[in-house]
Amino acid sequence: MNPITMKLVVDDLILQALREDITFEDVSTASVCPTARPATVELIAKADGIIAGLDVFARTFELLDPQSSVLFDVADGDEVHAGDHVGQVRGDARVLLSGERVALNYLQRMSGIATYTHQMAAALEGTKTVLVDTRKTTPGMRVFEKAAVEIGGGSNHRYNLSTAVMLKDNHIDAAGGVARAIEMARAHASFTTTVEIECENLDMVREAVEVGADIIMFDNMTHDDMAAAIELIDGRAKTECSGNVDADNIRALADLGVDFISSGALTHSAPILDLSLKHLRLLDGK
């Protein structure tokens, strides 16, 4: 992850998660480790998948104690298998025990998203279609989840509401129609801002093309209607398919010739990748 992003955004989010988990005291750790004791603990994969979030994992321990260190056997984007040794954390035993759950929560979540994204992106090989995520992210986790999508081989759609214009059904209703919504967006937003509009039928697509939308999203349209829409657009706008996308239908959608396929499932439905910290070893011989 970008070091500036890590410092300005990610550190605060990790600290918030640590405060949520530790609050006043880790009573379990304080009971068995009342004083500082050097130790190591091993990071082990318990399932097959793609690793993502190693820097966030390491940073969690560093924020608790700058003297903590992590040595990894893999890098973000690498494939791991059940039983693989992924890395070792070294530091005060109290820090290793207290930071374990938060660090693993980030790593498991990000690795799960990267794994699912990798599986979906693999189905698009040989096509021009780019797999993108959505804003359907866990509150407070967007920066991590979108980073995981990229590590898994996908791309990011707009990061937040200020990044691009995305006119959905309620925006169109509020504006009074497709053409009016696009015209109002052009008048308000910077000339550098991309204007995308969601269309549910061919009439909406035709109107969006005529007014000059940059990207036209086909929202839950039939396969035949999307094929007709792409022919109608004829390269005058980028095209995006969204809605009910899964591993079973993503290739057929890409074969239509759409530029982008967006899937909220990348972030809201990906299962975690099972990882564990095991075999804590005290180094002071006591």
Regions found by a protein language model. Give the residues of each.
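Basic/polar N-terminal segments that are highly enriched at the extreme N-terminus
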Residues: M1-I4, D284-K286
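Acidic/glycine-rich phosphate/pyrophosphate-binding loops and surrounding catalytic core
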Residues: N2-V211, I215, A227-L232, K238-C241, ...
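Short, structured secondary-structure boundary patches
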Residues: D219, A237-C241, R281-K286
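Short secondary-structure boundary segments
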Residues: N220, G243, G264-A265
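Short, charged, intrinsically disordered terminal tails
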Residues: A265-K286
